[in-house]
Amino acid sequence: MLLVIGLGNPGKEYQYTRHNVGFIAIEKIANQYNSSFSTKKKFNCEIAETISDGQKIIFIKPTTYMNLSGKSVISVKTYYNIYPAKIFVIHDDIDLDTGRIKFKTGGGNGGHNGLKSIDGVIGNNYNRIRIGVGRPQNNQDVADYVLNHFSKPEYETVMQAIDRITSNFGLILENKLEEFKNKIA
């Protein structure tokens, strides 16, 4: 069983912001598996489930807002008894150029409040799929930057990155994490 979490903020005003790249990616991946989201208030998230090659995949989008994502993650993790090694978090990363992707297991949170929240409830030994959204320019506040919408060229670049993640997601199901890491880079 895999738990795949896309980080973002609920609400139409945040839908296509840099901070919601995790939501955008997880919707595309879940759609690839013909799985659609429904709200589960007891888990504080939207959830979609599917089975692929005999393996259950649970996709979630926390509805707690970014800074409290751990609340949703711990409730789903506990209910389904999922080990951190089987948890994959997809999130924005300002330390990567727009559209660049990095995969890693464990490590620090890089100042990302969604990851801080998750680390606080399950530790940090889970998998991360980091999608670059670039750095703010001209002394722009980081919070303002990540809560702003992508420019059209940025959005196209990010969608190409998400397409690479989606088309190679099956490698995660086959536990070929190193190959996944190389194919998405």
Swiss-Prot record:
One of its GO terms (biological process) is protein quality control for misfolded or incompletely synthesized proteins. It comes from Rickettsia africae (strain ESF-5). Its EC number is 3.1.1.29. The active site is at residue 19. This is Peptidyl-tRNA hydrolase. The keyword Cytoplasm applies. The keyword Protein biosynthesis does not apply. Gene3D superfamilies: Peptidyl-tRNA hydrolase. One of its GO terms (cellular component) is cytoplasm. The gene is pth. It catalyses: an N-acyl-L-alpha-aminoacyl-tRNA + H2O = an N-acyl-L-amino acid + a tRNA + H(+). It is found in: Cytoplasm. One of its GO terms (molecular function) is peptidyl-tRNA hydrolase activity. It comes from the Bacteria.
